[in-house]
Amino acid sequence: LYTRAAKHYTGRATVPVLWDMKQNVMVNNESADILRMFNSAFRDLSPATIDLYPTQLAEEIDEMAHWLYNSLNNGVYKAGFASSQIAYNEAVKDVFLALDKLEIRLSDGRPFLMGTHLTEADIRLFVTLIRFDVAYHGLFKTNLKRIADYPAIQTYMEQLLNIPEIAKTVNLDHIKAGYYSIKALNPSGIIPKGPLEIEQLVKAAKKNAA
């Protein structure tokens, strides 16, 4: 797609990509932008009741998104690709401080980060949570705890996973194959079989979503 968009492109090819199939052009390759575009530019294609970026919560969502990215979404990568023990130690500390704070926030039983309304903040968090025990915990060495060791976060993740539209997007085999194919971190290319708990959860959620 990158060379179709620009014949002589020689840079990195990253995902996700939003591609215009009619114009044969790349619209955007930044996940945060694409997420917000789905909520605005494609409003006519989604139910009117869904608004992942409501005006009254916009400032709070922006603050949460900024914090999530720096401490957790990107934090796991800082740990996984750290080139020194000091950098790794700092990154891992930040990751688990963030998870500890999220555990406290979600311990009041709220279904979503902002309370009773599903927002883009939940989507941003979910994509890291669903990958954590499967890939980040082992491959990125963020192994102080698993998501399964955080009762409130685990319950929150399961609630999101039980939303059919979300469950249908999860493919643990693809997640594991993608991450464990990173030669710098896993030279053998061996893909682990587990963990069984999350596989069973995803299997049940996808069955209910069918």
Name each model-derived stretch.
Residues 1-210:
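C-terminal alpha-helical interaction module
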